[in-house]
Amino acid sequence: MVDQQQAEQIRSGSGFIAALDQSGGSTPKALALYGVGKDAYGSESEMFDLIHQMRARIAQSPAFTGDRVLGAILFEMTMDRMIDGKPSATYLWQDRRVVPFLKVDKGLEDIADGVRLMKPMPDLPALLERANAAGIFGTKMRSVIDAASPTGIAANVAQQFEIARTILAHDLIPIIEPEVTISITDKAEAEKLLLEELTKHLDALPADTQVMLKLTLPETANHYKPLVDHPAVMRVVALSGGYSRDEANARLSRNSGVIASFSRALTEGLSADQSDAAFNAQIASTIDSIHAASVAG
């Protein structure tokens, strides 16, 4: 059963969703921005220990609570670890009132027909069982759109909804994330096609079924407003997608009903060697700015 208290917080809460789900591929970059170079770890497991310390430090900072941070997206290894002596998802909800989500995709295929589809996920049912046992509320999976290709975008969205049905069958709420690359010249056209495909699939969902959408901030403000208002959509969240935090916040504030789900923009300005006071002050300032942009639209 979907937790109704958590569902209500995600559906109507005033705040944003923190993305703490850097995977193996993006972890070295995230650590480097945090001031931890490759010379600080000698193995992948040491690298993951360090990134978990960073995530735990963020989750335990005083400003990181459900008042402004409605939910947090975790990497599988984070779900399996502890924060302050409790399993991560339990800690987030019980101690911080932050709704836990799990990143479930296994990365991207090579580009074909202007898009990058998700790699196969043969272990997904087992992972979803573990997520349920851990108290996870929903999932997130990312694919990418690199061109305004009608057939490519149709295939991309179809794959997302096909896997979403498996996730829904496990009583979890899927965050569907077909990211549009911000640097492409035909971004506005790709977004037009994406809106059409998403609407088509949302219309086909059974009654009383809801999903979430995580989308690149569009070229035209309120382009995705029909999705914000769609009965099959619990919430629309935006990724920062390579925009600076200021640019992402500015774009976000022009899109009514859309809230943030930022990763890099959340950790911008944090450093491993900051004192707790400086670290917590930086996190509080960042959370304030992303929260303000999320509620401005």
Regions found by a protein language model. Name each.
Residues M1-F137, I145-P150, E197-G297:
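Alpha/beta catalytic barrel-like cores
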Residues T139-L213:
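Eukaryote-skewed repeat-based solenoidal scaffolds used as protein-protein interaction platforms
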